[in-house]
Design a protein with these regions (language model features):
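Short glycine-enriched, charge-decorated loop/helix-capping segments at active-site entrances
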Residues: 145-151, 190-194
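Short glycine/serine/threonine-rich phosphate/pyrophosphate-binding segments
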Residues: 154, 158
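An N-terminal low-complexity intrinsically disordered segment enriched in acidic/polar residues
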Residues: 20, 24, 29-32, 36
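Nucleotide and nucleotide-moiety/phosphate-recognizing core
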Residues: 31-149, 159-174, 180-185, 200-218
Length: 218
């Protein structure tokens, strides 16, 4: 563990990394702003043996957002048609102006693209309204970065999604897990569970990532 994560201050540049959220329609001279469906997916592997591992950092952020739903926390439920677990949150439960779908896939990380694309098709979600939360080796534990498009940084889950979307840009929310110690292979490191101390930093990072997503959506 390199350092203790702290709450980061909102960056003025963060909201600009995402596409505008509202659809604009004109009706007899009136400008009408219509809400959309925002899809937020936390990447990870299925099964209790992977629940606390570093590769599942994205799922922790989805759980943080589930806890923020009003008037009571939301829960994921199996959505067989898309091989995912989802929570549908009507306008006002999490987002003021938009319907939100929080999700995690029931497929393994390397084949995340199929379920994510299926969710987008089912809920008619555009790539600019997709937020994928993932673990990031190249960020220190506790750091959070939101970006639109860009490379996959060797992350197989992102590669799968990018391929399924035909290379169209979408929002990526990186949660830092740090580099493996010594000569440990990254593939082994990401499947190791967080230590008790790291879990404290992860909880703070999950809250920071949730804040960043909500700021970007606006």
């Amino acid at each position: 563990l390199r350092r203790r994560a702290t709450r980061s201050k909102p960056s003025p540049a963060e909201p600009a990394t995402a596409f505008p959220r509202r659809r604009v329609f004109r009706f007899f001279g009136w400008v009408i702003l219509v809400g959309v469906t925002i899809l937020i997916v936390g990447l990870g592997n299925p099964g209790p043996q992977y629940a606390a591992t570093r590769h599942n950092a994205g799922v922790f952020v989805v759980e943080e957002l589930l806890g923020r739903a009003t008037p009571m926390p939301a829960q994921l439920a199996v959505h067989k048609r898309t091989n995912t677990e989802i929570a549908e949150l009507a306008k006002g439960r999490l987002l003021d102006d938009d319907h939100a779908v929080l999700a995690r896939t029931r497929a393994f990380m390397n084949v995340s693209g199929g379920p994510v694309k299926a969710l987008m098709d089912y809920f008619s979600v555009k790539p600019e309204d997709l937020y994928v939360v993932h673990d990031e080796l190249d960020l220190e534990l506790g750091e959070v970065k939101l970006r639109l498009g860009g490379g996959d940084h060797g992350h197989n889950g992102l590669k799968s999604i990018t391929k399924s979307l035909g290379g169209k840009p979408y929002n990526k929310v990186a949660v830092g897990i740090g580099r493996p110690p010594g000569r440990m292979a990254p593939a082994d490191y990401v499947l190791k569970p967080f230590s008790a101390k790291e879990q404290v930093d992860l909880a703070i990072a999950s809250a920071d990532a949730a804040d960043a997503i909500l700021r970007a959506i606006g």
